[in-house]
Amino acid sequence: MRMGIISEERDWVTDELKSKMEKNDIDPVIIQPSKIISYIESEVKFEQNNRSILDLKCAFVRNIGEGVEMFHRFDMLKYLENYVPIINPMDGIENAGNKFRTSFLMEVHKIPHPKTIVAEDVNKALIAADKFEDVVLKPLFGNQGKGLVRVKGRSTVAKLKALNTFKSTHGVIYMQEFVNNPNNVYRDIRAFVVGDKVISAMYRTSDNWITNIHQNGVPEKCEITEELSKIVLAAKDAVGLVYAGVDILESSDGLKVIEVNACPSWEGLSRISEVDIAQNLIDEALNYAKEY
């Protein structure tokens, strides 16, 4: 049996999946999207290194790269999905990768999330920012806590400058109300859900308001409560994923979803959790392929 790992670059996650596949007597196939050639003729073919990839049992998507090429690669994988089960589904990856879509889906499905305003007009954004005592600007597309800007207690002139700078870099201004932790600490929760079960969770704490592990956040064990499990499963299903890393904030009125990650790493979780996440993913992938 051959199982794919689609990633433009090798990283800790691809190596973990590859190793776990080998331990399950599965032949891992590392697929670089840039190396796939598609034949669109009477017989549709997708090949890498002159070998078809249509015989894969299923394939994990890890990283399809950046730039203009990314749009082609996304479309290519979406069509490959007609022949090979792709995990996560490409529609779900698209929903999770766009913060506007994620926020919209949280609201449609009545899942608690911070108040959010999205605008392209800087002056309108400035008026909207005044609705919040404290606000965070986030790139629509991005991860690992990169590109975040917190606007708190600034003068109107300083806010306008921050918004103009953000707009010139990112094009669209996505603003989210800053949620204070009731315990007066900088921390959030990353919960890892596979199928219909939240299998692991951690607090990410920091002396800075950006708590991502890639921004020096420190992982600590987090109990999987009924409240946490319920909101994480709802977020995963709303976005349309098989598995996910869901980021949660604690607030004075309960938990709130801030992000749903469709291609999450569990390197940080592996430091504090005894759960074999890679094995859980392989098992779920085989079940998904069986029902595909």
From Swiss-Prot:
Pathway annotation: Cofactor biosynthesis; 5,6,7,8-tetrahydrosarcinapterin biosynthesis
Matching Pfam families: RimK (PF08443)
Positions bound to Mn(2+) 1: D247, E259
Keyword set, alphabetical order: ATP-binding, GTP-binding, Ligase, Magnesium, Manganese, Metal-binding, Nucleotide-binding
Any single Gene Ontology cellular-component annotation: cytoplasm
Cofactor: Mg(2+); Mn(2+)
Coiled coil: none
Residues binding Mg(2+) 1: D247, E259
InterPro entries cross-referenced by the UniProt entry: ATP-grasp (IPR011761), ATP-grasp_RimK-type (IPR013651), ATP_grasp_subdomain_1 (IPR013815), Rp_bS6_RimK/Lys_biosynth_LsyX (IPR004666), THMPT_Glu_ligase (IPR053432)
Residues binding ATP: 138, 176-188, 204
EC numbers, comma separated: 6.3.2.33
GO molecular function terms listed in the Swiss-Prot or TrEMBL record: ATP binding; GTP binding; ligase activity, forming carbon-nitrogen bonds; metal ion binding
Cofactor binding remark: Binds 2 magnesium or manganese ions per subunit.
NCBIfam families: MptN_Meth, rimK_fam
Subunit comment: Homodimer.
Protein name: Tetrahydromethanopterin:alpha-L-glutamate ligase
Biological source species: Methanococcus maripaludis (strain DSM 14266 / JCM 13030 / NBRC 101832 / S2 / LL)
